[in-house]
Amino acid sequence: MKQNYAKIISGFILAGLLTFSSCQSTHEMAKTDYQIAKVEGRMIDIDAKWDTHPDADAVAILKPYKEKIDNMMYEVIGSSEQKMDKGHPESLLSNLVAEVLRQAATKVQDKPADMGLVNMGGLRNILPAGDITVGTVYEILPFENSLCVMKMKGTHLKALLTSIASLKGEGVSGIRMEITKDGKLLNATVGGQPIDDNKLYTVATIDYLADGNGSMEAFLQADDRVCPEGATLRGLFLDYVRQQTAACLLYTSDAADEA
């Protein structure tokens, strides 16, 4: 089903209105000492079925903008032969995005980073089999996250990997981790080699994690940090898909099981 991107904007406005209107009721509920029993979430397409009686004047105003956005979003830039899911402890899609980050480190140094890292929360949809459109990538990577290349000692890298293990895994590339089902790190190697406490390693990640968010406080101990201007994760992934398509290469990824 084609997604109406113009309606996404109105969908966000509606969501904002609902948020504001619910603030008072949430505050009142707190007085009665309610407790949250369960939280669930799922992807909901914001398409024409939510707007069966569109305002004619609004449609006329938005029409030229909608056509421009649709032309851009529906552009097919590649094709995937397999469906790539996201999820812990690791997944095809998360590891692929981490590899794109790792390779993108060549923008600030003469080789890929030793490790690539992306958090599962930064990926908001799967990569389905079949055509890949610009809109597909926007659905997967809706945030304005940018590349950061961090340089850190082996001791701090181990702390980073321990944090990743405690989260039951994240999207990684260039490393191999063995973790238990309860989030304990058993072993880790970089490029097939044990981690040297005194060696400096480079980690390509996103600015959100580089700032210590997502339980990645170990990044705050980094010896160096370079975040090239304009290198958004979404832009890097779009470039990757286009380059693979131009070279007639398949989109591949690797994922292993937890210990």
Which functions belong to the PLM regions below?
Residues 2-10:
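Bacterial N-terminal signal peptides that target proteins for export
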Residues 10-14, 18:
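Hydrophobic helical h-region of N-terminal Sec-dependent signal peptides
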Residues 11, 81-85, 144, 221-224:
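Short coil/turn segments at secondary-structure junctions
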Residues 20-22:
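C-terminal motif of bacterial Sec signal peptides marking the signal peptidase cleavage site
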Residues 26-47, 95-98, 102-106, 110-253:
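Feature captures C-terminal
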Residues 51-118, 126:
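Hard-cation-handling environments
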Residues 254-259:
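A short, hydrophobic C-terminal helix/tail in secreted or cell-surface proteins
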